[in-house]
Amino acid sequence: MSDALSAIPAAVHRNLSDKLYEKRKNAALELENIVKNLTSSGDHDKISKVIEMLIKEFAKSPQANHRKGGLIGLAAVTVGLSTEAAQYLEQIVPPVINSFSDQDSRVRYYACEALYNIAKVVRGDFIIFFNKIFDALCKLSADSDANVQSAAHLLDRLVKDIVTESDQFSIEEFIPLLKERMNVLNPYVRQFLVGWITVLDSVPDIDMLGFLPDFLDGLFNMLSDSSHEIRQQADSALSEFLQEIKNSPSVDYGRMAEILVQRAASPDEFTRLTAITWINEFVKLGGDQLVRYYADILGAILPCISDKEEKIRVVARETNEELRSIHVEPSDGFDVGAILSVARRQLSSEFEATRIEALNWISTLLNKHRTEVLCFLNDIFDTLLKALSDSSDDVVLLVLEVHAGVAKDPQHFRQLIVFLVHNFRADNSLLERRGALIVRRMCVLLDAERVYRELSTILEGEDNLDFASTMVQALNLILLTSPELSKLRELLKGSLVNREGKELFVALYTSWCHSPMAIISLCLLAQAYQHASVVIQSLVEEDINVKFLVQLDKLIRLLETPIFTYLRLQLLEPGRYTWLLKTLYGLLMLLPQQSAAFKILRTRLKTVPTYSFSTGNQIGRATSGVPFSQYKHQNEDGDLEDDNINSSHQGINFAVRLQQFENVQNLHRGQARTRVNYSYHSSSSSTSKEVRRSEEQQQQQQQQQQQQQQQQRPPPSSTSSSVADNNRPPSRTSRKGPGQLQL
């Protein structure tokens, strides 16, 4: 230390710690000349002693002015060393960097100034301290003192220039440092970081694109910054990187795709738009690299399809179509199960557009990878069934298409119909709201006859009789009114003529027995008029309830529609279709006379021509809907000399059918009685005690009143007593008839 003091005059030593900047500056200039002379003479030991003295007595001094003098002195030494400074940097730079965290803002300012002067001298040799300097500058960029920020900004610009010129800069060592600070929220630090990313990316020899996954998330995080300038800088940097990706032959799409998927769900609109735009480009460019990320990408796209921002919706739809058009196989790593899982989750979305696209994906996978989809059927089947209750008709129609695609296999067809019936049973509102839509669409997508036969088979063994009746009534109404089932109606019209119609009639009859009106409608459709009349005659008082009359009202109105045109035309020949008339009159007799349906049917029957009755015997008693040209080859159910209903026609044993109908109806009647009895007993048991108690109280009151009257009345004579007895109205006892018990 004495060597250092001998080399430095006392005045210089004293002025370095002076409170006046000018004195410190002059002392530093003198120190610079001293070091130059020592360098020229090659006295490296003295130079080291001088540096050591500046650090120990000045830079580390508790006095702020001493620390300021030490910093300016170290800068002066570096300038004096000039080209020889590199070998002393290990001594000079660390204390300057440490001063960046000094509590005194003026010391921090002079530290920036000192390091700036040092960097100007040593240039590229300065790189070995880059990470420490970068860390210090990152903190100084957010310094509370504006002067320190300004000085740090100047130093930062110089360091950037040095780095871009240097071939010693290590991007591999720098990236972890950058990544560690990318999530800092301070706006000044963010500007500092984006500035460095942009500068380094502009250097041809530095491959920032290869390290983009390490700091991409941080850049996206800045897109939602409150500062417009920071958002703009981050967006500019991202746009530049995206352009580089388009022009680069090799990019790590996978790691970045994971980040983009998360950012696509950001609450910030600008961030979502940028993320979905990147995903769109990745899907176009990524190719095989993205196969295993398709499920994650789809999970990000589907919600964006329903985004409130139109730009996001447009890009999301484009990306969705692009992704769906890619042809990949499970052997390439395409995970069908993962895609199905995403689609299943999105079926619960609150947005209709997202649910529709999720169903489109399931349908696409079913067409392209049927075997794999069926392996995961149990995972998605319940969700698909629940979707039948969706509030959107478009969603329901798409769900039915998916179900129809699955039901191409016989075992899945049966399973589908069973589950449909189960859902209708579990949710009564589903049958009311969606029943017609579901059944009609299933009849279009799958064979209508096949669907109705399967439904009939299932309902035939239904234990819940009320549900079976309701379901059959719904199916019957669909059968009578839906354009999609016109071929089925035509087939049933020939039930008495051809085998196919007969088999369908018998298949439906078994379950249609749950509803008298459905059976009557089926017979009218099949032109089995005698059997319809017999069914009407078999009805009892219990069957004619409000529900029955409502169904009858619907049928009467349907008779006036084009569907039953053939039936109305047959009324032109009442002699030939006597059983049809008897059936219609039977329905008329069941209707209340003041009802609209009664008036409609009565008006129709009034139009039946009477002249045909006189020729009825000549035409013959062919009372079915079978064409007369075929009559002599038929034996219609109503065309028997003895009107024997126990005969059969074309294999249809109507006697057995009638017995089957009555058996089912007896079950319904028994259940109705049980329900009424249960309701009666449950209500009477709760009130019987109260009624009994009330009666006892009334009897006690009557006895008390009678006693009071007897006490007040004078004793009667025998004459007056007999007169009074004659004038008194007869008692309940005197009014009892023969064999009547006294109450």
From Swiss-Prot:
**Keyword annotations of the record:** Cytoplasm, Membrane, Repeat, Vacuole
Bias-annotated ranges (Polar residues): 718-732
- Where found, per UniProt? Cytoplasm; Vacuole membrane
Pfam families named in the record: Vac14_Fab1_bd, Vac14_Fig4_bd
Specify the domain of life of the species encoding this protein: Eukaryota
- GO terms for biological process? phosphatidylinositol biosynthetic process
**Cellular compartments per GO CC:** PAS complex
Q: Where is the composition biased (Low complexity)?
A: 678-688, 697-712
What InterPro entries would the database entry show? Answer: ARM-like, ARM-type_fold, HEAT_type_2, Vac14, VAC14_Fig4p-bd
Q: Where are the HEAT repeats?
A: 45-83, 87-124, 128-165, 169-206, 210-247, 251-288, 292-329, 334-371, 375-412, 414-448
Q: Is Repeat a UniProt keyword of this protein? A: yes
Where primarily located?
Answer: cytoplasm
For the region Disordered, give the residue spans: 624-647, 670-743
The membrane topology term of the UniProt record is: Peripheral membrane protein
PANTHER family the record matches: PROTEIN VAC14 HOMOLOG, TAX1 BINDING PROTEIN-RELATED
* Record's subunit section: Component of the PI(3,5)P2 regulatory complex at least composed of ATG18, SAC/FIG4, FAB1 and VAC14. VAC14 nucleates the assembly of the complex and serves as a scaffold.
What job does this protein perform? Answer: The PI(3,5)P2 regulatory complex regulates both the synthesis and turnover of phosphatidylinositol 3,5-bisphosphate (PtdIns(3,5)P2). Regulates the synthesis of PtdIns(3,5)P2 by positive activation of FAB1 and by controlling SAC/FIG4 localization.
What is the name listed in the Swiss-Prot or TrEMBL entry for this protein? Answer: Protein VAC14 homolog
Q: Which organism is it from?
A: Arabidopsis thaliana (Mouse-ear cress)
